[in-house]
Amino acid sequence: MTEPLKPRIDFDGPLEVDQNPKFRAQQTFDENQAQNFAPATLDEAQEEEGQVEAVMDAALRPKRSLWRKMVMGGLALFGASVVGQGVQWTMNAWQTQDWVALGGCAAGALIIGAGVGSVVTEWRRLWRLRQRAHERDEARDLLHSHGTGKGRAFCEKLAQQAGIDQSHPALQRWYASIHETQNDREVVSLYAHLVQPVLDAQARREISRSAAESTLMIAVSPLALVDMAFIAWRNLRLINRIATLYGIELGYYSRLRLFKLVLLNIAFAGASELVREVGMDWMSQDLAARLSTRAAQGIGAGLLTARLGIKAMELCRPLPWIDDDKPRLGDFRRQLIGQVKETLQKGKTPSEK
């Protein structure tokens, strides 16, 4: 308030007027120049990720069709009719003292109650799977937000859902690193770098173990039907374990929905990542000449199991990938190849002796 006012400044020249941008003249390329011309393209990884997210959102979003509404209305009317008829039968049995009919009504009521409870439980678990996609979108918004007050509550909710105890060392380090002056982006980023890797490491170990078991089973077993059943069972078990690690309890329909989303993701992304991560390395090492056909099939099955686990991890994870921390097939490739080679060498050693 006590500082003196600055004196006025007079400019001699006129103000600069914004001029319209000048475009260069049209240039026509001949055939030789056109062959060397390469148009700029979008990042294929970002474009593919956006398309996959759109497919997953469409699959998670319930379809509000007319037939669906008619079926739901018919089921609701049928359920109300069954309840009303059951109440009427119970009253008639009580008035006429027909204890056999009354016992049948009680048994029917227990069966209907168990069925309704199962439907409600399945719906709640399926709703929880859908909420995980919304939580991932919320985390993505918080990672670009400069506000305060929402990041800490959001991260504490994620830790509670995952079953991380308040005395866990990673959570204690996160609490010690945050303070009131940090915005939501910084708080969520600290959680992603300090607490989330604990769950990610456990999921990676599950994926690595399942991929190794699939690889060795295919490489050793001579029965294709047994191999297919084993791989299907191991993949479903892997999805259940990954979902449990990230705090998602799967029911029957939610398990089918998650498995469908994983297969959709893999089919939509195609085999480009598999070829990019594995193809050149296999050609360079000439594994086809070193390993048997069954061993090569085992490595392929193990890599597909690893890819399935990575996609399940991506769908169940509450946070988007940050700083290129997404696991890659190359992380599991060398381990699978080393285990197959070690198994084959152990099998050849006794025969040589």
Curated annotation (Swiss-Prot):
Periplasmic compartment spans: 1-69, 121-212
Membrane topology, Cytoplasmic segments: 91-99, 234-353
Membrane topology, as annotated: Multi-pass membrane protein
Keywords (A to Z) from UniProt: Cell inner membrane, Cell membrane, Membrane, Transmembrane, Transmembrane helix
UniProt-listed InterPro entries: DUF697, UPF0283
Family: Belongs to the UPF0283 family.
Listed name of the protein: UPF0283 membrane protein YcjF
Gene expressing this chain: ycjF
